[in-house]
Amino acid sequence: MGLRTVLASQVLPALEAVDRSGNRLDNRLLPSCFSYGAPASNERLPEDLLCALWDEAASLSGEPDFGLRAGEQFMSARSFGITGMLAWHSKTAGAALTNASRYAALVIDGSHLNFEHDGQVVSILGSDDPRPKYWSRHYGEAKKQAFLSLLRRSTGLPLVPHLVEFRHAPGMDVPCTSKFSAAG
């Protein structure tokens, strides 16, 4: 199977958060698409490089919860490309999840979000892509936090996370699962 790529815009929140902390990522670490500011909206990076850039940004910031903060403050619908814009303009959380699931592969090659709901609880399950995804901690946390924030802002619902699990390293048998519900 080929190398998995992601939208280059997925690294911009990490760069903004590092800049805001008074540090700068070494330009030699950045791919050429960042030479003149933000990359084109369709520019792609190898997933491993994206995770390495997020890890380096977190290291420079010195924050243990860098990914959560960057996901909340700096990721937007635009960070997720057309997928985020479709989710943002959905009228319901269900429509937003359906759109995000349908177009997830535009953000990360091979991605397809599976989700289930049971009354007020929605479970977002990992992709059915056979290639395992072990994101860096900070990138994984930023994506989950940003997606939750995007759903909250686009629907106006007070969504509350119940359970979030990540696979951080090979050999760990933990499913990528998120559960949240609308409080109230």
Residues of each region from the PLM?
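N-terminal low-complexity or simple alpha-helical regulatory segments
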Residues: 1-123
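Alpha-helical bundle regulatory/interaction domains
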Residues: 90-184
